[in-house]
Amino acid sequence: MSTPPHTPEILQGEANGAASTEPEPREGALPNLVVVGAMKCGTSSLHYYLDLHPEIAMSSPKELDFFVGRPAASPGLSPGGNWHRGIEWYASHFDPSARVRGESSPNYADPLQEDVPARMAGVVPEARLVMLVRHPIDRMISNYRHVVASGREAEDVAQALRRPGNIYVRRSRYATMAEAFLGSFPRERLLVLRDQDLLHRRRETMARVFRFVGVDDSFWSDRMERLRHQSAGKGKLRATAERLGLHNLVARLGLGGEAKWWVEKIVSRPSKSSAPAMPPDLRRELLSDLEPEIAGLERLTGWDLASWRV
């Protein structure tokens, strides 16, 4: 695992790279809750439900990607990340008056983002982390549909999932992802949840999350009955919004609550496209490859994941 960079030019985003003192974050302005992933496992829904709680203020936009920093030439990674923007930029997205301040960036759990856990431990060492997981094959298919819809995947599902180092299999290695964070954070500050619990046992699951972050666990809102989907076609919508300068519309208008939900719903409407067929031999091949990951997650959580092996 790489160590977190502490040079002022990284932390402050200085163009000239001149040495200076690392800025002190504003008291209470940094997050103490981070939903780290996994992608296509329900992080948008969880982010929305958390933001409904009166003691919790989640970031807008949802995915700040602050701890991600990658050069454009990195194999398997698109250019992006906001590590270069500095702590003050990051802190500006959180309400200092909120008891719990959080964000949700599924890119944090990507195993290729080796610097993320140590960077987080250096900036928000007391943060509590939440990771959502789902059946790895279902997650791969959902991720594949998302990338196809955004115009970034031209190969069929079998070719894409057999491609060495592909994002679909890589981001389904949950045990590897969890262990990376446990190298920088104690076990009691990582909560791992199944998407099916959020889907079918939402009240109990949200009460558990609320207890984990230290707020009133009896809170419930009728708006939690909704499932907040990420759209398979959201990539194109987001790109269009950025070209039009509308990507931070919710934040600029100061929208919250019901208005915020409806505006985000309009630009996140799910695609009607059907899931691609998974060849049986490919499914067996992938599950065999992921067996150590499934077993590792069982050891970490105490779950019985027999249903994931078929």
Language-model-detected regions and their locations in the chain:
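The conserved 3'-phosphoadenosine-5'-phosphosulfate
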Residues: 2, 62, 179-284, 288, ...
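Acidic-and-aromatic substrate-binding clefts and catalytic sites of carbohydrate-active enzymes
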Residues: 79-84, 108-114, 169, 197-201
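Short catalytic/ligand-binding loop motif for oxyanion handling, primarily in non-cytosolic enzymes
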Residues: 44-45, 66-67, 109-113, 137-142, ...
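Alpha-helical packing segments of well-folded alpha/beta enzyme cores
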Residues: 86, 90-93, 116, 174-178, ...
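PAPS-dependent sulfotransferase catalytic domain
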Residues: 118-119, 126-132, 138-204, 208
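Generic structural signal for small/hydrophobic residues in well-ordered secondary structure
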Residues: 42-43, 90, 102, 120, ...
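Surface-exposed cleft-lining segments at the edges of enzyme active sites
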Residues: 74-76, 103-108, 158-169, 196, ...
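PAPS-dependent sulfotransferase catalytic core
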Residues: 1-108, 123, 127, 137, ...
